[in-house]
Amino acid sequence: MPRRRHGRLRWCVVTPFHASPRTRRLLPIAALTLASALALPGCEITDGPADTAPGPVSANSALGATDGLTVKGRAPKTGYERSAFGSAWLDTDRNGCGTRDDILAEQLDDVSRDSDGCKVLSGVLDPDPYTGGRVAFVRGRSKVDIDHLVALSDAWQKGAQKWSDSKRRAFANDPLNLVAADSSANRRKGDGDTATWLPPNKEYRCTYVAGQVAVKKKYGLWVTAAEKDAMTTVLKSCPDRKLPSGGNPTEAGSR
């Protein structure tokens, strides 16, 4: 009969017991035979390995950081305008180029620029993080957007409406919150949070959600209960994923 020892089955030979009309009278003998077999070396009764409890979640992981996010309901969208976050694509890092061109230059391949060295004229996004496909970028008729991982409207409804203008400008131009992505996928996302939209490219979901957690932690934005549950579900599939860091300061000038 098989016995489990240190997680593996070991076999012990037991003389078979065949039922007969004398079954009742032989039951004590069968019981004795079984007990003797179990007493043989290597046949002792041992428990299998106990289920291993999950280890502690690292505070440096995206999953650990999710636990620290404040949970509240979504505030009204009343008063939201894109202009509340400043003019689009400022030069917050003072390198002479707008944020959009900085992100394009960093995240596209085969980049060509105009004579001033700032404007990105063409390039290739391969792979596109949201779909996993290949997207060509040509300035003026682009199929590539620069997406805010945490949408401006979502931020507005979860704390940003109480920020200073300077902090909102920093948020809108922070590279930590920006990714070049397929325009069609980005527009399907809209201002959705993790509970309502995830990239079709499943391989990117951990990176995507970890980025959202990092941004919300950095800027002190809250999450809804459904959003936190969705974040946790994704990040449990990659519990060691580190929380992204860096980006720009949380205050920015007006140009």
Question: Model-found features: residue ranges?
Answer:
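C-terminal motif of bacterial Sec signal peptides marking the signal peptidase cleavage site
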Residues: 40-42
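N-terminal low-complexity, Pro/Thr/Ser-rich intrinsically disordered segments
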Residues: 49-84
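Acidic, divalent-cation-chelating loop motifs in proteins
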Residues: 89-93
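Acidic, glycine-anchored loop motifs typical of Ca2+
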Residues: 94-98
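Bacterial N-terminal signal peptides that target proteins for export
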Residues: 4-13, 17-30
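Domain-level detector of nuclease and nuclease-like folds
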Residues: 129-255
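Acidic, aromatic-lined catalytic clefts of primarily extracellular/periplasmic carbohydrate-active enzymes
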Residues: 100-149
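Bacterial signal peptide processing site
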Residues: 44-47
